[in-house]
């Protein structure tokens, strides 16, 4: 079975079994919704168990969640630095033009049919996502995911076409 990362437990929150999660999904409200099931993976990326979300709220940059049946800090302390993942069959269908992170990471980025590099990571600093493009012999390129920059995405071809605005790439 394939699983996809949705977050990392970074700490406990209070004494009532809540955990701080650093989310790595565009769909935090959906993933951490009460009643949803996620898979818990340990620090060595080994499956531990399925967990059901009992509660979720957002505080600053963290998602605060609680697992059903685990209502005290003693029950959840051991999960620090564990990962939360969603099973592939639990992924919902997306609208046309929407993509999951795992579909974008690894795509090659081209400008005017010239290969710039490969998307290695997606950041969520604010209003829009920023794609981190790993380039050979150059620093990583931070590419905002906005229409004037990203011209087209072809998952089947493993390709993203972009137009880099003047000043965005300081190594040109």
Curated annotation (Swiss-Prot):
SUPFAM superfamilies: PRC-barrel domain, Translation proteins. Binds ribosomal protein uS19. This is Ribosome maturation factor RimM. It comes from the Bacteria. Keywords: Chaperone, Cytoplasm, Ribosome biogenesis, rRNA processing. GO terms for cellular component: cytoplasm; ribosome. It is found in: Cytoplasm. GO terms for molecular function: ribosome binding. Its main location: cytoplasm. The lineage of its organism: Bacteria, Bacillati, Bacillota, Bacilli, Lactobacillales. Transmembrane segments: none annotated. It comes from Streptococcus gordonii (strain Challis / ATCC 35105 / BCRC 15272 / CH1 / DL1 / V288).
């Amino acid at each position: 079975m394939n699983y996809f990362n949705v977050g990392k437990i970074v700490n406990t929150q209070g004494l009532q079994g809540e955990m701080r999660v650093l989310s790595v999904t565009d769909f935090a409200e959906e993933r951490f919704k009460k009643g949803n099931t996620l898979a818990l993976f340990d620090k060595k990326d080994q499956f531990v168990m399925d967990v059901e979300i009992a509660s979720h709220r957002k505080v600053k940059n963290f998602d605060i969640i609680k697992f059903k049946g685990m209502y005290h800090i003693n029950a959840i302390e051991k999960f620090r630095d564990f990962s939360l993942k969603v099973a592939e069959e639990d992924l919902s269908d997306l609208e046309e033009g929407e993509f999951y992170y795992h579909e974008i990471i690894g795509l090659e980025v081209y400008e005017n049919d010239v290969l710039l590099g490969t998307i290695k990571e997606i950041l969520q600093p604010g209003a829009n996502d920023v794609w981190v493009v790993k380039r050979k012999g150059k620093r990583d390129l931070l590419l905002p995911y906005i229409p004037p920059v990203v011209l087209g995405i072809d998952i089947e071809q493993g390709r993203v076409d972009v137009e880099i605005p003047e000043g965005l790439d300081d190594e040109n």
